[in-house]
């Protein structure tokens, strides 16, 4: 008598990085990120660099679900650290660069990260706080592509198998602004972040050929999740600005199709004489978020840009 063996259907990997990586274009040598200083990163660069940092994190023998707290200036390498943390299956915790010692002490004490990454200039006071809270690993990362994190990652392989995650596994923790008491950590799962990115990709009509101007900080939702995930999930080129420079951004508008910003950024762009209908001729989507946009600002923007 023969017994029919039933195959168990394996579940797909719910790791957000797996979805983002699957959206990379076929031509991995195409430019993925162009910085305001003329540096270019290909999609292959993003894949390899994130793999190296992920291998570094794995080599630390962290516990499952370990938190990686990051307070660094905006840079492509900081973005790669985020992707690497997802890729390796750990939990990313971005911290506002304006936070001082008392705030950092609270967040690190509350979140209990296994890894803390800070700027070189802040390491002297961040390291004692982290070590007192039980953090075993402290690295530095600066916006000139230097620091102990990149030094250590440079010795790691550029091949990495994406960690298997379930939809409801934690991907990131973002602390609230603390308007009703002490800041609280909002727990965001891989499912949360991917579903949000997919909905916005569809709603905003991301298409092949879209180019994003990324001028937002990456320590909060708008810059890290809404803008970045949208571009990566669409395989879109990113024009990267580490600092908001209205004149240089206006000069890049003809090369872009999508821009996301907070209302104050739109006010600053309106002060530039180069902001004309001709300058935005290729733009199809401007998004204002994170705070209310005054109707006066909206009307002036519409008048200037059409």
Regions inferred by a protein language model and the residue ranges of each:
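A short N-terminal helical cap/helix-turn-helix that marks the beginning
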Residues: 9-32
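Conserved AMP-binding/adenylate-forming core of the ANL superfamily
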Residues: 12, 29-75, 79-83, 100-105
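Conserved pre-ATP/AMP-binding loop-to-beta segment of ANL
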Residues: 13, 28-29, 156-175, 182, ...
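Conserved AMP-binding A3 loop
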Residues: 40-44, 171-195
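Structural core segment of the AMP-binding/adenylate-forming
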Residues: 59-60, 64, 87-152, 160
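A short helix-loop-beta submotif of the ANL/AMP-binding
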Residues: 67, 73-93, 97-101, 109-115, ...
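Adenylate-forming
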Residues: 73, 118-125, 216, 244-245, ...
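Conserved AMP-binding/adenylation subdomain of ANL enzymes
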Residues: 194-211, 219-258, 272-274
